[in-house]
């Protein structure tokens, strides 16, 4: 019996060459709608699917292949006598190859289309044929990815057939695709914060040499439903990105995106080590570098403005893994690309995630992204912060959001002077931040931000000894009154933001 292939593709990349190959191997081709016309126009012998079903397509093409003559030919078990007798009685021929790709719902759902227009890009017949063929993979070769055409041609050329292992892998790819496709549709239609089932749709963006450590395998997947900052970036120079690079890039970009003003942020091991605002990019970088010129070595530097020539010259003086910015001037690129390995990343999108996911053993935690800065700002002390201190406090509060808890940030003139994070005790985080500020700058009249409340007045006492003049913290401790009184004793102003920023 002559073999048959059913072809129905939206993405017609490579399909002419593949169809010609199948014909050359004596395989009869059946096709639908636009694919049929495309093959016919290119002089490929093809049978319209309606000749097989004896039923014209209807409802603007919504119903074409949903027919027993198609799915019977796909799903019948060739080694089951009853199945084959049924096909013969009903004059149904088997189908041996199913080549189908889907309407581009992933892409169209992000476009500026009406709800009704997006609905029309939900494929019904395509996934149904793919799933039928994948279930019957022992008998049917199912191809859902244009990148598989060449490998299948090689298999057929070698043995006039496709191996069991290849068929099984192709079937797995189908269910991988259709589950992601259905997950995207579910997200689109439900539009719920926390639905009964968590269906997320991601696609592999790149393989990685390894994960956080060299013995860990890793890959990077991007969200099919959104164009996030870490999806739509462009690498202009340097080695391939690593797992740790992307983690650090994500944090650095989120920090600089927090500010409308010109901002520079240096990151090491997913922790900000220097953040500053400036009148220009060069000035912002100098201030961020000054915070911690040791930790920045081998780190990542992010900007929310174009990197210019003057800044590029300074950046080229030290070893950096990555520089990420919305753009680079021509002169800056000429300077920075002299170092072949430094990764230059052009990123224009603002962070857009509405949810954060954390994998735990046996489950996933999901929460809203921490996009809120404060609930209310209330000065609770006798002393009031100056206008500059208020600006510095808000600056420090924006930074402390991105430091692992317990977190303290000391700042002055829109520049971090000391960052203390990842400590199990708040006083230890304060000691670290204040010590760094004193060692590097010997600064006085500084401000201090805390990601959570002070359980005791000890942080206030330490702050008073180290030149702190203004503090911002969420409040909520049973000992808030003690902290206020200690501030009053030391003429320190304090603002309650009434919103905690734990980061684990």
UniProtKB/Swiss-Prot annotation:
Q: Where is the MGS-like domain?
A: 1-144
Q: Which pathway does it take part in? A: Purine metabolism; IMP biosynthesis via de novo pathway; 5-formamido-1-(5-phospho-D-ribosyl)imidazole-4-carboxamide from 5-amino-1-(5-phospho-D-ribosyl)imidazole-4-carboxamide (10-formyl THF route): step 1/1; Purine metabolism; IMP biosynthesis via de novo pathway; IMP from 5-formamido-1-(5-phospho-D-ribosyl)imidazole-4-carboxamide: step 1/1
Q: Which GO terms describe its molecular function?
A: IMP cyclohydrolase activity; phosphoribosylaminoimidazolecarboxamide formyltransferase activity
One GO CC term on file: cytosol
Q: Catalytic activity, per the record?
A: (6R)-10-formyltetrahydrofolate + 5-amino-1-(5-phospho-beta-D-ribosyl)imidazole-4-carboxamide = 5-formamido-1-(5-phospho-D-ribosyl)imidazole-4-carboxamide + (6S)-5,6,7,8-tetrahydrofolate; IMP + H2O = 5-formamido-1-(5-phospho-D-ribosyl)imidazole-4-carboxamide
PROSITE patterns of this UniProt entry? MGS
- Provide the alphabetized UniProt keywords: Hydrolase, Multifunctional enzyme, Purine biosynthesis, Transferase
- What Pfam families would the database entry show? AICARFT_IMPCHas (PF01808), MGS (PF02142)
Keyword Iron annotated: no
Q: What is its EC number?
A: 2.1.2.3, 3.5.4.10
Single Gene Ontology BP annotation: 'de novo' IMP biosynthetic process
This protein's record includes keyword Hydrolase: yes
Instruction: Please indicate which superkingdom the organism of origin belongs to.
Output: Bacteria
Record note on domains: The IMP cyclohydrolase activity resides in the N-terminal region.
Question: Per its UniProt record, what PANTHER family does this chain match?
Answer: BIFUNCTIONAL PURINE BIOSYNTHESIS PROTEIN ATIC, BIFUNCTIONAL PURINE BIOSYNTHESIS PROTEIN PURH
The similarity annotation says: Belongs to the PurH family.
Q: What is this protein called?
A: Bifunctional purine biosynthesis protein PurH
- Identify the gene encoding this protein: purH
């Amino acid at each position: 019996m002559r073999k048959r292939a059913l072809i129905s593709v939206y993405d017609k990349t490579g399909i002419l060459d593949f169809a010609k190959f199948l014909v050359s191997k004596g395989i009869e081709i059946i096709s639908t709608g636009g694919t049929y016309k495309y093959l016919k126009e290119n002089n490929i012998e093809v049978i319209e699917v309606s000749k097989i079903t004896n039923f014209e397509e209807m409802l603007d093409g919504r119903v074409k292949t949903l027919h027993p003559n198609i799915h019977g030919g796909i799903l019948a078990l060739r080694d089951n006598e009853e199945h084959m007798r049924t096909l013969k009685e009903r004059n149904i021929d088997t189908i041996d190859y199913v080549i189908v790709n889907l309407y581009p719902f992933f892409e169209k759902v992000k476009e500026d289309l009406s709800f009704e227009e997006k609905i029309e890009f939900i494929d019904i017949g395509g996934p149904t044929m793919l799933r039928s063929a994948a279930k019957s993979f022992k008998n049917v070769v199912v191809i859902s990815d244009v990148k598989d055409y060449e490998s299948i041609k090689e298999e057929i050329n070698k043995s006039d057939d496709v191996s069991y292992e290849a068929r099984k892998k192709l079937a797995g790819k189908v269910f991988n695709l259709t589950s992601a496709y259905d997950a995207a549709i579910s997200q689109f239609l439900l539009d719920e914060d926390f639905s009964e089932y968590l269906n997320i749709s991601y696609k592999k963006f790149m393989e990685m040499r390894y994960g956080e450590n060299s013995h860990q395998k890793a890959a990077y997947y991007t969200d099919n439903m959104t164009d996030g900052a870490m999806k739509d970036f462009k690498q202009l120079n340097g080695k391939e990105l690593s797992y740790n690079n992307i983690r650090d890039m994500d944090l650095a970009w989120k920090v600089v995106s927090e500010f409308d003003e010109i901002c520079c942020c240096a990151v090491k091991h997913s922790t900000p080590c220097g953040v500053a605002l400036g009148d220009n990019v060069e000035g912002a970088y100098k201030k961020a570098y000054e915070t911690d010129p040791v930790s920045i070595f081998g780190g990542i530097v992010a900007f929310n403005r174009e990197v210019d020539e003057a800044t590029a010259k300074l950046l080229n003086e030290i070893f950096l893994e990555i520089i990420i910015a919305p753009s680079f001037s021509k002169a800056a690129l000429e300077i920075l690309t002299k170092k072949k390995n430094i990764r230059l990343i052009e990123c224009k999108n603002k962070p857009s995630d509405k949810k954060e996911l954390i994998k735990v053993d046996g489950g996933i935690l999901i929460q809203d992204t921490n996009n809120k800065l404060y609930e209310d700002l209330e000065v609770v002390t006798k002393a009031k912060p100056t206008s500059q201190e208020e600006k510095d406090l808000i600056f420090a509060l924006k930074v402390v959001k991105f430091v692992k808890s317990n977190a303290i940030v000391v700042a002055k003139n829109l520049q971090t002077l000391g960052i203390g994070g990842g400590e199990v005790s708040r006083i230890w985080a304060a000691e670290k931040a204040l010590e760094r500020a004193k060692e590097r700058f010997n600064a006085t009249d500084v401000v201090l931000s805390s990601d959570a409340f002070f359980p005791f007045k000890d942080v206030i006492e330490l702050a008073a000894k180290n030149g702190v003049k203004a503090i911002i913290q969420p409040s909520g401790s049973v000992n808030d009154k003690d902290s206020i009184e200690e501030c009053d004793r030391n003429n320190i102003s304090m603002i309650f933001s009434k919103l905690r920023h734990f980061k684990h």
